[in-house]
Amino acid sequence: MIEINNNHNNGNGKQFPSSQIMPDSKKKSIVKIGEYTLGEKIGRGAFGQVFKGLNGKTGEFVAIKQIDSNKIDESSLQSVKGEVEILHKLRHNNIVKVLGVVEVQAQLNFILEYVENGSLRDVIEKFGPLSEELCIIYLYQMLQGLAYLHSNKVIHRDIKASNILITKEGVIKLADFGVASQIDSESQLRFSVVGTPYWMAPESIEISGCSSASDIWSLGSTMIELLTGNPPYYTLQPMAAMFRIVSDQHPPFPTDISKEFLDYFQQSFKKDPTQRPTAQELLQHPIFFTLQKVPPTLSELQSTLKTLNGGRSRLRTSVNSIDWGSSSSTSGSSTPLSSSSSSSNIKSIVSDEDFNKLQTTIKQQAQTISNLSEEILILKKELKEKPKLEEQQFYKEYFMALAISVKVNQCYQDKTCEPKDMQQLYEMARSQEIPWYKLIEWIPSQLISNDNIPQLTPSSSRENISLSNSSSSIPNPNQNQNQNNKSKSKKFGFFS
C-alpha cells in the first residue's frame, strides 16, 4: 500500500498542511514598478487609478497612482505633473506626501503616502452622517491643511469628502491635487471652470476668478456633506445645481446644528469671496472653543495611585518572601549574601518615603488639574453667554438710537427742547438713570414693525418685560400709543 503524505516540507525540515499552500490558480502575477510591488486597487483619482504598493526594500506600504499618458490630453497631463510638483514641495501633517515618481514607458506612477482608512466619503457611506462634534474635529484639521496650502500660494480647487483621506488614528489628509493651481499672490485669480459642481463656489462657476476663498466655500459644502450625508443641491442635476449656487444667497443649511456651526456656514458662504474669512482666520472661530474639554487626567491619576499602591503591596510581599541569608547559585549551592548593603538597597525599592513622595506629587498635579478644569468650565460658560449679551446690547443700542431719533424729531416740531437736552437725555439713558427699555414707549407703533426690527432670533430664554409697571421721569409725547407699544414689545420679547 502506498501512503500519501498531505504535508509538505518547507525546506527547513518542518512540515505544514497542504491547506496552507496557495493554489497556482490563485497566484497573481507580480507587477514591479521600480522597487515597489503593485497590490490591490484602492481607489480612483482625477486622472487615473490608485493601487496599494509595497516597498520591497523597506517594507513600507504606499499608494501608487497610475496614469497612462497616452490616454489623456496634453493639458490634463500637464495638470497631473503640476500636482506632483505642488505636492513634492509641501510637507504638512494634514496633506498627503508625494514620495516619488516612477515612469515606465508611457505610464506615470506617482508614489504617495498610504492612508489606510480611505476617504471621508468612504467613512460616511459606511457609518452614515457624522456628529457635529466629530465634524468639528475634522474641520479643524482641514483648515490647518488649507491654511498651509494657502500660505504657500496654492489653491486646491476641488475640496470634497472623497478628496479628504483619514488615517486609522483620525488624522485628516488633503489629497488629489489634480486641479490645484499655484498663484503668485493672494490677489491673483485663476480663470477656468474646475472642480466638482455641487461643491463649487459661485465665482468658479461664473469664471470670475478662483482664489483661496473658493476653497473656503467648497470646504463649507464638504461640511454639509459630512453632516447630512450629501452635498448641497445633490437632488438636482449638475447644471441645475450650479445655477442654484449662483442664484441663491447661500446653500440650504442643515437643521439641528449649533449656533456656532450656523455662524461658521454664514461666514463661509458669503457670496462676495473677498468677504469670506481665510482658513487661518477660521481657525479662531468660536466653533472650535467646544474642542476644549475638561482634561480626563483626574481619573487617570486616581487610577495611577491605585495601581501604585497595588504594586507597592505586591512588591513588598515579594521582597519579604526572599531569604536574605542565602541565594541560589547556578551550581545549586546556597551562598549567603555577603553584603548587607545589597539587602538594604533591595528593600529601599519599597520604602514608604519614596512611594509617599510620588503619591504627593500626583495628588498635587490632580489638584492643579482640578482647578484648571473649573476655570475652563467658567470660561466655556462665559463664551456660551457672550452671544446673548452681544445680541441684547445690539437691541439696546438699536432702540435707544431709534427712540432718541423720534424724540429729537418730536422736539424739533414742537420746539419744546434744545439739542443739548437730547444729548443729556441720551447720556441719562446710557448711564441707566432711565431704564433703556422705557425708551420704546417714545417710538410710534408704526415704526416698530418686522421691516424695521433687526432680523435676529431672540433667545428663547429671554423673559418678556411688561412696560406697564415701569416708570420714568421723562414725559411721554406718545402717551396715547403706549398700549400699542407695550403689546409690540411683549410680542417680540426682546428684553430681559
UniProtKB/Swiss-Prot annotation:
GO cellular component: cytoplasm
SUPFAM superfamilies from the UniProt entry: Protein kinase-like (PK-like) (SSF56112)
Residue ranges the record marks as coiled coil: 353-386
Domain Protein kinase, residue spans: 36-288
InterPro entries, per database record: Kinase-like_dom_sf, Prot_kinase_dom, Protein_kinase_ATP_BS, Ser-Thr/Tyr_kinase_cat_dom, Ser/Thr_kinase_AS, STE20/SPS1-PAK
Keywords (A to Z) from UniProt: ATP-binding, Coiled coil, Kinase, Magnesium, Metal-binding, Nucleotide-binding, Serine/threonine-protein kinase, Transferase
List of catalytic residues: D158
Top-level taxon in the UniProt lineage: Eukaryota
Ranges for region Disordered: 1-25, 323-345, 454-496
EC numbers for this chain: 2.7.11.1
Bias (Basic residues) ranges: 487-496
PROSITE patterns according to UniProt: PROTEIN_KINASE_ATP, PROTEIN_KINASE_DOM, PROTEIN_KINASE_ST
Residues bound to ATP: I42, G43, R44, G45, A46, F47, G48, Q49, V50, K65
Similarity remark: Belongs to the protein kinase superfamily. STE Ser/Thr protein kinase family.
Record-given protein name: Probable serine/threonine-protein kinase DDB_G0284251
Organism: Dictyostelium discoideum (Social amoeba)
